[in-house]
């Protein structure tokens, strides 16, 4: 069994270099995308003015048209898709590149404006689309594209026609297929049986060819499930590892049951019984006496309790209200399938298998596993990292990082291992992955050792070890490959990676862009000449990411 694939880019394969930018190299810096010959991260005093924040972005891009090569006025090439004010008072905007009204897949630009000054741009835009022979009318229909994707799933993934669920609507995009952008359909095929999947297909709109495909289990959409009316109460039960926990429940006098429904956090935390079937969400967990000590209860106790801990961590440490930032309800189903050796975020809720008792215990028994999977939901609502190649490895690393930080926050025998509480119960000291020593379980701890094949969506669970090691070194310090890193502690490390994830990364960010994002996040939080900034640079140097 491949441990690395248990917890669950685009072929842009970015190579990046840092260069001084503009007349004042001391004030401005840039990470350069070698493939597209355009910037992917620019920071410094870029442009000042009294215009609306988005107008500053348009003006700057127009002034630097020879650098960004958009081929026209920026306001005609970019669509503002998000605007917010962060905790530092910065106006943070997300723009999506368009070509004749059609979205360019993965081409998202994040801009920061502070006190009337444009201070950073993050994200890769595809240049000179007007100079290419790009079609904007499809030769095949949406229905044909969807049939092609579903048939490929049946042929290559499930070996039978899956029972498809509603996924994201199919849409036309300009897809950067290597160095040749093409008009394509983005098709989402989502299913639970015979095995769970959430596949993204890029189908050539001219001839129906499959340009790319990957399993992105973590695409988000609003969840379902109905709460019960009743009185908030506190129950008690025993978790997977035998520890006692107090849990928030709801008593319904109408039904005469206590339900695993926590009304004290956001829009609620709900835990369901899958009854060893593969239908979601199952039944809202009910109990007659508010005491959950049966062995069958254990997985539900942990799923419910740990979901509350994750909610509290993001709220109390980062000021984030649930995974979407707007207090979305958190729903979990336990006892999914029979002996199912995995856990996943299916786009609307958490799903936990019971494990087979030998390789895995019930997955909800690992607090870092719960934190890991719910962080995928946070990523979906922020950077939206494509679950393939380096962007996918960053996606996985973010979940490992914050799953571990949740474990330390709860102070439940915390360590830098992933999944150690529920993996191979008969083997002491074993885990799925290690942040402190990725090589312990066969994962790379330096960019020179990265996996470059196509398995595991391009090594998302493998190459995450490189970023995990950088995060560990940033927190704890140490010497790695001859590079000395001064540790700044877990709290500051978490703040930096959170800010990079939420306010700087884009769907196709790679490791070099992550480095630039973390450097900028540290500068925002602690100052550009701070030890924290130096430590970020040291940590990424130590793992060979520049």
From Swiss-Prot:
Binds 4 Ca(2+) ions per subunit. Binds 1 zinc ion per subunit. Ca(2+) 1 binds at residues 287, 289, 291. The keyword Cytoplasm does not apply. GO terms for cellular component: extracellular region. Its cofactor is Ca(2+); Zn(2+). Thermostable. The active site is at residues 373, 461. InterPro entries: FTP_domain, PepSY, Peptidase_M4, Peptidase_M4/M1_CTD_sf, Peptidase_M4_C_domain, Peptidase_M4_domain, Zinc_Metalloprotease_M4. Belongs to the peptidase M4 family. This is Thermolysin. It comes from Bacillus sp. (strain EA1).
